[in-house]
Amino acid sequence: MTVRRALVLVALAASPLLTAPLFAQEVVVCGTDELFILDLATPTPRKVWSWRARERPELPEAMRGTFKTIAECKPSEDGRRLLIASSSHGAAVIDRATGKVEFHATAMNGHSIELLPGNRVVIAASHVANGTGDRLSVYDLDRSGVELFHVDTPWPHAVIWDAARQLLWADSQRDVVGYRLTDWGTAAPRLTPAIVAPLPDSNGHDMMPVPDSPHLILSTAAHTWLFDRDTHQFAKHPRLGDAAKVKSVHVDPASKRLLWVQGEGTVWWSEVLHLHDPDTTITLLGEKVYKVRWMPPARPR
């Protein structure tokens, strides 16, 4: 595979990332029209997988231009699938092994996507001046683009399925909401708000589970929080509590290593990946990174 841009390692100390094979050693990265997987287990990180909508013949031609700015890239099912949403108004489910698009839909200012029980998927379409944004939309995975249900919510940016609590968590401009899956065995499913927790400040952004805990890690405009899914209380994150403009944040389930991207200056992107425990930065020269997620490690068959 040709690496199109220089990838420069600024600092990478000896760490669990490099020495323990059960820890994640790859990350999936997005922000532009290229979705790629980066291998961090080498002295210089390298791209080992790449995907672009314009190269996918199974994707309708009209949809290929809706993935110019991929705003979410989330591994699912132990990394066998990649879930993407684009602020250029598209969303898709991709088979990692083949790159094939298994599902696609229009999502105005798409910012997040999640698989749900019953072979369904939910997409968070954030705010647009004109159009059908500010909503969570539910689809069947085998019926691309056919919306079954939507619920209005202002500026949603993240959706997380919580199997233990049987709730879909979604953030918005002002709340974190836990939705119940209602009438889910029918052709007319609904999302019913069960828990509404007002944000401690405005503009919910990224949100991901903290492994082996009741917490979600949640970034807002000015801070990064831990949200307790049982007590519905917020507390500042011990490392990133006062970090503003955190666009992406993720904790590796195995090593518990923290990975994040922070917007630089007035732009929404960064060239720098930040890691904690130990502290490390990785600079990807020429890239515009918005989201980065740990990829689950390959498991023995």
Predicted segments with their positions:
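Short loop/turn segments immediately following beta-strands, especially the blade-tip
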Residues: 40-44, 180-188, 229-234
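Blade-loop segments of beta-propeller domains
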Residues: 51-81, 86-89, 97-114
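Short, solvent-exposed loop/turn segments at conserved positions within beta-propeller repeat blades
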Residues: 86, 126-134
